[in-house]
Amino acid sequence: MNQDLRSAIGNRHWIALCLGLVALGLCLLGWFLDPRQFFIAYLFGELVWLGVALGSMGFLMMHYLTGGMWGWPTRRMLEAASKTLPLLGLTFIPIFFGLHYLYPWAMPVQVAADQVLQHKHPYLSPFWFVVKACIFFAIWSVIAVLLNRWSRQQDSTHDVAPLIRIRKWSGPGLVLYPLTVTFTYVDWIMSLEPDWYSTMFPILICIGQMLSGLTFVILLLFWLGPRSSLSAVTGKENFHHLGSLVFAFTMMWAYLAFGQLLIIWSGDLPHEISWYLHRVAGSWHAVVAFLVLFHFFGPFLILLSRQVKRSRRALAIIAGVVFAAHIVDVWWMIEPSFYQHGIHISWQNFTALLGIGGVWLFFFTRNLESKSLVPLNDPRFALAITA
């Protein structure tokens, strides 16, 4: 047990677990009261925390390949977040029982009346949805478990063989990550409106996930740093590098989001443009304005300042804003598929987000406690802190 971290966190992880279980209990009540809204909200909550875990795994593999200074104080957090992927595979299971509430292709009546759905039925069907989800969760879980296992082996030996294995497999892992996300998010989000398609959408999802994983660890690093041994290896330069990454990924997210909009809007094809029309109709345009301001323009303009990137508090505030904006972005991708005339907010959105999040934070913290907060016996780490 990491006593350093345990003294900093105290019993907060147990509080998170209790709150999460209470929220999940309320979700169960929502299942009986309004099953359709329950599955909409549950899908939203699941994909928010899955995005944090997958984005963290992506950054973890990126750090193993590059060895950047930004990764040393965050590596354990990235490892702990990625190790929750098997848990998120289990929490995804309830969605299998509500496909007919979420997806038109799971409703035989709609399939019979829609030629597009009939054409896509060999790929979009309940059976293959479950099979593909199980396969891809297995792939993610295997990658995460191996990365964590080899990292633990490196901690216990001066032999660099585990580090070589990690670097050897991180390259293919970074290829598998966007490929698997492409297939899964076509099923999980794009097929909520199965007539719609966009080749840019999956990579936009990947960038959003990595941004959510990055901002999450920045928030944790800001809160935990002064309370733990991380303070000795976390300085202004580290925060500067992390701030530069937030800046870069914010720009990439905006570039892809605008590029997708521009291509679809200029094409003006009914099957493509309808997705955006549903998301700007009525009061939904206020959510678009929120995302433009807080997911791009605000962070972009503020992070132009070198002083902001080097300030722990300022960067943590920006990270918190971007993380919150990403949650709204996931909600905006899902909710208008069902409520196309204006904003619809249900209490089940909050209980699902908090319920899955509370359980996730508990296991994340337990994973984080199981190892030293700084890497051991990694020769690159020694070089980084003396540079």
Model-derived features: positions:
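Transmembrane-helix bundle segments that line or gate the permeation/cavity pathway
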Residues: 46-156, 173
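Hydrophobic cores of alpha-helical transmembrane segments in multi-pass inner/ER membrane proteins
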Residues: 53-61, 89-95, 133-145, 207-222, ...
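Central hydrophobic cores of alpha-helical transmembrane segments
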Residues: 313-324
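Short, highly charged, low-complexity non-transmembrane loops/tails of multi-pass membrane proteins
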Residues: 373-387
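Membrane-interface capping segments at transmembrane-helix boundaries
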Residues: 145-155, 363-377
